[in-house]
Amino acid sequence: ADKEILIRRLSLDLTGLPPTESMVKDFSLVNSDEDYAKFVDKLMSLPSFGEKWASVWLDLARYSDSRGYQKDNGRTIWPYRDWVITSFNKNLSFREFVKKQLAGDLLKNPKDEDYIATGFHRNTMNNDETGTVDEEFRVAAVIDRVNTTWDALHGTSFSCVQCHSHPYDPIKHDEYYKFMAFLNNTRDEDTGDEAPNIRQFKETDIQKLTNFEAKISSLPTEQKTYLNRFVKFLEPRFHAHYADNFIEGALLGGTQIGLRHTGSCRLPNLKTDGVKQLLLQYSSKNPGGVLQIRSGSIDGKIVLKVKLDTTSKGKLLTLKWPESTGRQDYYLEAFNGKLAGKADDVFKIVWFALLPELNLSKNNFEEFLSLINTKTDNFPIYLEMPKDYSRNTFVFKRGNWLVHGDSVQADVPAFMNKFKPEWPRNRLGLANWVVDAANPLFARNVANRFWEQLFGMGIVETLEDFGSQGAKPSHQKLLDYLAYQFIFKYDMKPKALIKEIVCSSTYQQDSKA
């Protein structure tokens, strides 16, 4: 192709922008393959390279600054977008790129950026409408994550297996839910605050956080880790929708436990081994309110009773928890004789947490509570459920989340590469399986998508369907070659594979027939 055409082609494909006047001048001096390769490197070193190629990935990740459904409220998840851009500009290996997005929180000593990377699967829709069932839409989000993992990372339609075995490809109905089990134990629950979030403290509060971290540095590792995680994520905690069996009360707006005079609700199946304190965030507008907790049943033993301070805003309350072990139901009760016969709530509870032994001085504990109350910028991330509250995964008969079949354990489809015994049966193990060199689909899918971006059509034309009903590769050996290079020569670094393609004579030829 003429140089004028080729520089325009390169600039648009690599940076998403037309070439500048100086680029055109510099390219006119390119007279050898070596000069051409250096010019490609120069284009790929520009910040706009990451912005252009990140946009391709962000479409696959269904990135949006809103939550979807009828309200489509805003979502603050731009740090994930910026992380993707930075990853492409830094030429991060797709091994790490995928691992961080699927399981950054499960890496050893994860950094903030590793948590932010897990925003990949927090781009699911979130239903903020009052009266909806949070569990229904949590399940819908998990199903979306399963389908996206296969669409984006394998170029394979997996969604129809939700309802029945695949009619054309060797994927069984129960294998869908075995795969879903990898993704079914994260803390997100379709809550209005989109928890869990990573909290970003403002400049004026960072010193307060740093001072607290220094003060707890001498604590045992387990306690120190717990405190740091709670301040950073406000986890583990229980949201208001954990409560059920309301009497003279209700789940208000899906976000608060509201109990009137003599009202009650159940907190089911709480595990209290090692619990020393109950921490809850509440409001109580009317003076004279009393909170009471019974164990075992609505008529069970009273284990806690406290007169509440009057507050219209969310206030933190800590109560000493009685020695107990095992699992059982607990019941919240509300009393305020002044509200008898009235529709006013005695109190509202947003969330509660069961705290272990923390060994904090009074001053340090007050600082801990102050940091919890500090207003922060919050960004949705992935976090794993505590093991004591891990979910069971079931086959959904005909894809109906309400009709459970057999219980299943996390596994991958039998026709794919084997899941190695040294990998944990969680999202980190799944990420290892995806990027393993033995995976027949991942590298081919990436190479095919890169080719499509540069030529307008993939070697496999059906980008999302590498299955038996998708288009056959137009040049199968070429696709295999690019996948091999990507894995074994380039260590899955995207710039190297893109460079090989744009430096080829095929890419540089004239587009005229």
Where are these regions (language model features)?
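Primarily short, surface-exposed interaction patches in extracytoplasmic proteins
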Residues: 1-8, 18-48, 64-108, 218, ...
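Short His/Asp/Glu-rich catalytic/ion-coordination signatures at enzyme active sites or charged loops
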Residues: 19-27, 31, 63-80, 126-133, ...
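Conserved AdoMet
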Residues: 52-53
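Active-site regions of oxyanion-processing enzymes, predominantly non-cytosolic
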Residues: 93-97, 179, 329
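Extracytoplasmic
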Residues: 218-371
